[in-house]
Amino acid sequence: MKILDLIKSRRSIMPNQYNRSLIEDRDINLILDAANWAPSHKKTEPWRYKVLKNKTKDDFGKFLGKKYKESTPNFSNFIHNNLIEKTKKSSVIILICMQRDPNESLPEWEEIASVSMSVQNMWLMATNLK
């Protein structure tokens, strides 16, 4: 696929569109490898990813539901249950994290931008794999 076609065809897939098919480890590794090729100023490579599957993924959904319940004054049972169900519909969840340069040698926004670019690389690789 040509790069411009790939960029134009990238779309977000929402949980109600999931088809419950498993994502192969090989594909997850390709997606994570693409993320590592994002540019980062001063080579800080601030992106960190955590891959959740099976029970860990389901436990994360319960954690989200619990935190929502603890922190929301206008609690909604629908939203609470939806948070938990969305994680169950996913075969894999990749958590996006950022680790600042310990020396803070560049502005935080530059590291956020690097993480954002690595996520874009992930989306493009996932689109290419479909």
Language model features: what each stretch is:
Residues 11, 98-101:
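Short, histidine-centered active-site or binding-site loop motifs used for metal coordination
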Residues 1-89:
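N-terminal amphipathic, basic helical "cap/leader" segment at the start of enzyme domains
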Residues 93-97:
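Active-site-flanking beta-strand signature of metal-NTP-handling nucleotidyl enzymes
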Residues 35, 100-130:
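Small-aliphatic-rich amphipathic alpha-helix that forms the alpha element of a beta-alpha
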